[in-house]
Amino acid sequence: MKALILVGGFGTRLRPLTLTLPKPLVEFGNKPMILHQVEALAAAGVTDIVLAVNYRPEIMVEALKKYEKEYNVNITFSVENEPLGTAGPLALARDILAKDHSPFFVLNSDVICEYPFADLAAFHKAHGAEGTIVVTKVEEPSKYGVVVHYPNSESLIERFVEKPVEFVSNRINGGIYILNPSVLDRIEPRPTSIEKEVFPAMVNDKQLHSFDLEGYWMDVGQPKDYLTGTCLYLSSLRKHKPEILAPASSNIIGNVLIDPSATIGKNCKIGPNVVIGPNVTIGDGVRLQRCAILKSSRVRDHAWVKSSIVGWNSTLGSWSRLENVSVLGDDVVVNDEIYVNGGSILPHKSISANIEVPGTIVM
């Protein structure tokens, strides 16, 4: 089987982290975001993966080629000279996607979930139409475009309704699809939206079904959703791979993922919902909650971090405090006793004064 991952462009929503690495290479749960998808695709029997990229492709190539042998997959890079939207990349990769006339998966690189690829493929084969999209249920459908089915069908899509004022459905597009190669005949190699142009045409022809996703789902393309997604991911690990999580103790509260190479000081309180990356050093008396500490960072004694992301190689000084979706880029230093409230700090900066106004960007 084959798959195309829509990697996309600049990752501006996840800055300042994406000023250092393309978004798919930013770690989520201590592995690059895109590796979660590659692993799941390989486990479902996918052997050919196309990455549609238009930003820093050389870094993507270097980083991901090493996974080909590990997961026994062929990874091909389809490089866009201009952004082609969510449908144009399919036309650009037509030779690969259509080569054996079998269906192929398409997915957005920002989506983290319990990927249902094997069940999705079986469901798609059973109904026989051109396409199937994964849908997930949400509590506030008025914020999204929703999927509406025909009254006599649980899966055949009748229409899409953008941000409905009155309730018509609570299912939204989950950013994961399986399509027959015939769908490629509907797409031209130009900037095109699969959601706004291709799918409505398929709906008109009664060729698009939906598949309900079980379990969690999150688009982790911006910091607050990255943190929420981390909570959901750790809960999923607790159900399916509890041995990966740190064992509960007087210092560990709830779901916590710690790389074996990290060093943890005395009298810390860590958790719930914390990820600590490789070669991280945590000092004595540190409090961490609902946060991610990325590779090779240092959190000095008695620092306090909540609902924040600490980028690679950064240092939090003693008695410093970071909260309210603060994000540190690569190699940031927050000096001792400094308070950062919802700040976004670009790489290689040193912070010596409090940041008290949420949304402040330090350039």
Curated annotation (Swiss-Prot):
Gene Ontology terms for molecular function: GTP binding; mannose-1-phosphate guanylyltransferase (GTP) activity
Pathway recorded for this protein: Nucleotide-sugar biosynthesis; GDP-alpha-D-mannose biosynthesis; GDP-alpha-D-mannose from alpha-D-mannose 1-phosphate (GTP route): step 1/1
Entry keywords, A to Z: Cell cycle, Cell division, Cytoplasm, GTP-binding, Nucleotide-binding, Nucleotidyltransferase, Septation, Transferase
Pfam families noted in UniProt: GMPPB_C, NTP_transferase
Subcellular location: Cytoplasm
Cellular component terms (Gene Ontology): cytoplasm; cytosol
Superkingdom of the organism of origin: Eukaryota
CDD domains reported for this sequence: LbH_M1P_guanylylT_C (cd05824), M1P_guanylylT_B_like_N (cd06425)
Catalytic reactions of this protein: alpha-D-mannose 1-phosphate + GTP + H(+) = GDP-alpha-D-mannose + diphosphate
Keyword presence, Calcium: no
One record GO biological process: division septum assembly
Record-listed E.C. numbers: 2.7.7.13
Main localization (coarse): cytoplasm
Keyword presence, Nucleotidyltransferase: yes
Function in brief: Involved in cell wall synthesis where it is required for glycosylation. Involved in cell cycle progression through cell-size checkpoint. Required for the correct assembly of the septum.
Family: Belongs to the transferase hexapeptide repeat family.
Protein name per UniProt: Mannose-1-phosphate guanyltransferase
Organism of this sequence: Schizosaccharomyces pombe (strain 972 / ATCC 24843)
